[in-house]
Amino acid sequence: MKILCIFLTFVFTVSCGPSVPQKKTREVAERKRECQLVRGACKPECNSWEYVYYYCNVNPCCAVWEYQKPIINKITSKLHQK
């Protein structure tokens, strides 16, 4: 009877989780979605103006470096008027 109880417990715990192919498919879809969030694309090779954000399944997620304007602090002098 104990063996039957242990066997049933094992069967129920194993059957409750997602199967390996379903889990892998879900992970790949999440990676592709994250790649799109950073405005990237999953493709075989990145161009020179792109960097590898991470890998979507087998191909890299290529994201474009964002151009940021340099911050220029203007130096202004105040003339004292008397």
From Swiss-Prot:
Protein name as it appears in the record: Beta-defensin 113
Recorded superkingdom: Eukaryota
Main localization (coarse): secreted
Pfam families assigned: Defensin_beta_2 (PF13841)
Primary role: Has antibacterial activity.
Residues making up the signal peptide according to the UniProt record: 1-16
GO CC, one annotated term: extracellular region
Family (UniProt): Belongs to the beta-defensin family.
Keywords, in A-Z order: Antibiotic, Antimicrobial, Defensin, Disulfide bond, Secreted, Signal
Stored InterPro entries: Beta_defensin_dom
Localization per Swiss-Prot or TrEMBL: Secreted
Gene: DEFB113
Disulfide bonding pattern of the chain: 35-61, 42-56, 46-62
GO BP, one annotated term: defense response to bacterium
The organism of origin for this protein: Homo sapiens (Human)
